[in-house]
């Protein structure tokens, strides 16, 4: 597997940094692949059983990395001039699954101020309960997602709101999987602006 480190990582960090938010990009553990990760991933998707076996092995490790990252940033926030109570997490696709995992399984020292799973799978959150002190959630996905993750994204939103927790959902008609910060001349081009609007609404863009 591979990380989409630019359109779903560095570019997002640069966008929020321009609005006064410190962005950290996490490289979490992935399934082992050869040189052509895209080709191998496509073949794995064609074999549903093999794909889910892979997820069962790697997702817990990736979520553990996400949990550790939030805790680490909170513990070192004061050194970097960041408030530990304003540390949140956003992730896309597999990173969205990491974000969802953090949303459900954090410990007090790793409490995220907000969570934003974008076109996320929820392998570790399907049977999990919403935490009592769950943070606000922002969710976005495209209905024509090739991996079929729009329903899972909607399910995350529904689970949050059913527990009477704050959540916002954006489901786009088109955009496919992995739209991230890529420009496609579609409404998904502006999801990041809706995310910024939501951050401002929550008070996270105010110093």
Language-model segment annotations:
Residues 1-80:
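Serine-hydrolase catalytic machinery in alpha/beta-hydrolase-like enzymes
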Residues 30-32, 122, 176:
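Alpha/beta-hydrolase active-site loop signature
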Residues 39, 140, 161-207:
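C-terminal catalytic histidine-bearing segment of alpha/beta-hydrolase fold enzymes
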Residues 46-47, 53-56, 101-102, 126-131, ...:
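Flexible, surface-exposed loop/gating regions in the mature catalytic domains
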Residues 60-133:
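Primarily recognizes the serine-hydrolase "nucleophile elbow" in alpha/beta-hydrolase
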Residues 67-70, 157, 196:
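Generic structural signal for well-ordered alpha-helices
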Residues 113-171:
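The feature captures the conserved acid-bearing segment of alpha/beta-hydrolase catalytic domains
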């Amino acid at each position: 597997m591979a990380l989409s480190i630019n359109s779903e990582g560095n570019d997002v960090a640069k966008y929020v940094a321009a609005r006064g938010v410190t962005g950290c990009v996490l490289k979490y553990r992935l399934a082992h692949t050869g040189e052509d990760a895209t080709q191998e991933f496509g073949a794995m998707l064609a074999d549903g059983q093999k794909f889910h076996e892979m997820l069962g092995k790697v997702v817990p490790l990736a979520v553990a990395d996400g949990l550790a990252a939030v805790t680490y940033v909170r513990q070192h926030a004061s050194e970097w001039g960041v408030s530990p109570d304003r540390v949140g997490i956003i992730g896309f696709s597999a990173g969205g699954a990491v974000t969802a995992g953090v949303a459900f399984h954090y410990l007090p020292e790793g409490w995220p101020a907000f969570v934003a799973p974008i076109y996320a799978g929820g392998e570790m959150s399907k049977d999990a309960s919403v935490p009592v002190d769950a943070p606000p959630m922002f969710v976005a996905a495209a209905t024509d997602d090739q991996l079929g993750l729009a329903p899972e994204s909607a399910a995350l939103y529904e689970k949050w709101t059913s527990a009477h927790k704050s959540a916002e959902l954006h489901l786009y008609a088109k955009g496919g999987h992995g739209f991230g910060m890529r420009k496609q001349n579609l409404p998904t081009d502006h999801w990041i602006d809706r995310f910024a609007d939501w951050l401002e609404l929550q008070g996270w863009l105010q110093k």
